[in-house]
Curated annotation (Swiss-Prot):
Organism lineage string: Eukaryota, Metazoa, Chordata, Craniata, Vertebrata
Domain of life the protein comes from: Eukaryota
Record keywords: Acetylation, Cytoplasm, Cytoskeleton, DNA damage, DNA repair, Lipid droplet, mRNA processing, mRNA splicing, Nucleus, Repeat, Spliceosome, Transferase, Ubl conjugation pathway, WD repeat
Name recorded for this polypeptide: Pre-mRNA-processing factor 19
Pfam families: Prp19, U-box, WD40_Prp19
Domain (U-box): residue spans on this chain: 2-73
Organism for this UniProt entry: Homo sapiens (Human)
Cited function: Ubiquitin-protein ligase which is a core component of several complexes mainly involved pre-mRNA splicing and DNA repair. Required for pre-mRNA splicing as component of the spliceosome. Core component of the PRP19C/Prp19 complex/NTC/Nineteen complex which is part of the spliceosome and participates in its assembly, its remodeling and is required for its activity. During assembly of the spliceosome, mediates 'Lys-63'-linked polyubiquitination of the U4 spliceosomal protein PRPF3.
Main location: nucleus
Length: 504
């Protein structure tokens, strides 16, 4: 009987068998393999020298080695070479199988690591955005005294007992009249000329998005619902969010100057004071809050309404606030004392108010209602002097032009109507696409351009009333739009919680 070693493929001198694989080996070769690896070379199972079983056979008589110059010698050399190749091939197959298993395991680990990295990256991004809304800026660390011209902090944040309304005293009425006279005189001096610095229509039509900021408000409660620019420095941006916060943002430094917290519901209206470091906000929590920007604190809470506050406008004097509400009243309040001077409702209508806006002169103002009416009021007499019917659906926004005689209105009927206050009639209707929503209307400071925000952002040139610009960058509904100084840029906010800027 002839035995062949599974390692050398030769007849072994001291054959033995492995009980693990049942293969025959040359003892000296298998002992060396076990010393190095401790396993059976065929199936890699653990194997020790003690487990090897010797095989007793008659020793074959080895033939004499052939001469190196004979054909048998060549055949023997080829046979030896073949044996070596086979042994090497066997080893390579074993190594290949091991490598494949290791590679498969590594690929599974890599896939799992990629998933973990993607999840952590998403969490880090959300955390950074949340941090951006909470991180105080250096300018807010040191408290500053509120100037004497600003409202007192006494009773800030506490409910106000309005008691009897103060009323429109002769002094207040005279103050309003004097301011209106000054503004009317200035408007007449300007005439129909527009500022030389104002961006021309052909330049405006080339505006494109140049910046987008999404870290102002909370990522967990997305949506910016209100927008205003500081009249004296349009680089300062004011926003109100669904996260109940009011944010003051600096466009030039791209930094949050203040995050103002205090409302218990979303913030739907915000207004910048033109000359003081004050901002105003209104919310469905039925409060109007007056904030000090340097201190990042609330200095006054005006409780003029019993239901959600839907509109907010600052009088040209900078001393009084107009507000509208779901409680069907409009209110006129003093920002210095926080007291409500007068509250009026149209008893014949019995309908909630949706928005309110002062005329540039401040002696009249407009309100929008849930039943599609635009009402013009005389502030001094507190009387409804004109009504503009024609819309269908709740009024969503109204805007007076700086020229003093144009009024733009929008409702849930996919249209914008232009009214001439001198003739008290509708002279133009901008019919938009079906299901187009309009949430914000505003004229630029010169009355040359009209911007509307809603489903998209659209810019119209007044008098011709033709669209010259259209932006669709917001992934959600646009809730606010505003012009920079001399229309050098345009800002917009949306439910995608982004603040976007457009310019050349």
């Amino acid at each position: 009987m002839s035995l062949i070693c599974s390692i050398s493929n030769e007849v072994p001198e001291h054959p033995c068998v492995s009980p693990v694989s049942n293969h025959v080996y040359e003892r000296r070769l298998i002992e060396k393999y076990i010393a190095e690896n401790g396993t059976d070379p065929i199936n890699n199972q653990p194997l020790s020298e003690e487990q090897l079983i010797d095989i007793k056979v008659a020793h074959p008589i080895r033939p004499k080695p052939p001469s190196a110059t004979s054909i048998p010698a060549i055949l023997k050399a080829l046979q030896d070479e073949w044996d070596a190749v086979m042994l090497h091939s066997f080893t390579l197959r074993q190594q290949l199988q091991t490598t494949r298993q290791e590679l498969s395991h590594a690929l599974y680990q890599h896939d799992a690591a990629c998933r973990v990295i993607a999840r952590l990256t998403k969490e880090v991004t959300a955390a950074r955005e949340a941090l951006a809304t909470l991180k105080p800026q250096a300018g807010l660390i040191v408290p500053q005294a509120v100037p004497s011209s600003q409202p007192s902090v006494v009773g800030a944040g506490e409910p106000m007992d309005l008691g009897e309304l103060v009323g429109m005293t002769p002094e207040i009425i005279q103050k309003l009249q004097d301011k209106a006279t000054v503004l009317t005189t200035e408007r007449k001096k300007r005439g129909k000329t527009v500022p030389e610095e104002l961006v021309k229509p052909e330049e405006l039509s080339k505006y494109r998005q140049v910046a987008s900021h999404v870290g102002l408000h909370s990522a967990s409660i997305p949506g910016i619902l209100a927008l205003d620019l500081c009249p004296s420095d349009t680089n300062k941006i004011l926003t109100g969010g669904a996260d109940k916060n009011v944010v003051v943002f600096d466009k030039s430094s791209e930094q949050i100057l203040a995050t103002l917290k205090g409302h218990t519901k979303k913030v739907t209206s915000v207004v910048f004071h033109p000359s003081q470091d004050l901002v105003f906000s209104a919310s469905p929590d039925a409060t109007i809050r007056i904030w000090s920007v340097p201190n990042a604190s609330c200095v006054q809470v005006v409780r003029a309404h019993e239901s959600a506050v839907t509109g907010l406008s600052l009088h040209a004097t900078g001393d009084y606030l107009l507000s509208s509400s779901d409680d069907q009243y409009w209110a006129f309040s003093d920002i210095q004392t926080g007291r409500v001077l007068t509250k009026v409702t149209d008893e014949t209508s019995g309908c909630s108010l949706t928005c309110a806006q002062f005329h540039p002169d401040g002696l009249i103002f407009g309100t929008g209602t849930m039943d599609s009416q635009i009402k013009i009021w005389d502030l001094k007499e507190r009387t409804n002097v004109a009504n503009f019917p024609g819309h269908s659906g709740p009024i969503t926004s109204i805007a007076f032009s700086e020229n003093g005689y144009y009024l733009a209105t929008a409702a849930d009927d996919s249209s914008v109507k232009l009214w001439d206050l001198r003739k008290l009639k509708n002279f133009k209707t901008l019919q938009l696409d079906n299901n187009f929503e309009v949430k914000s209307l505003i004229f630029d400071q010169s009355g040359t351009y009209l911007a509307l925000g809603g489903t998209d952002v659209q810019i119209y040139i007044c008098k011709q009333w033709t669209e010259i610009l259209h932006f669709t960058e917001h992934s959600g509904l646009t809730t606010g739009v505003a012009f920079g100084h001399h229309a050098k840029f345009i800002a917009s906010t949306g439910m995608d919680r982004s603040l976007k800027f457009y310019s050349l």
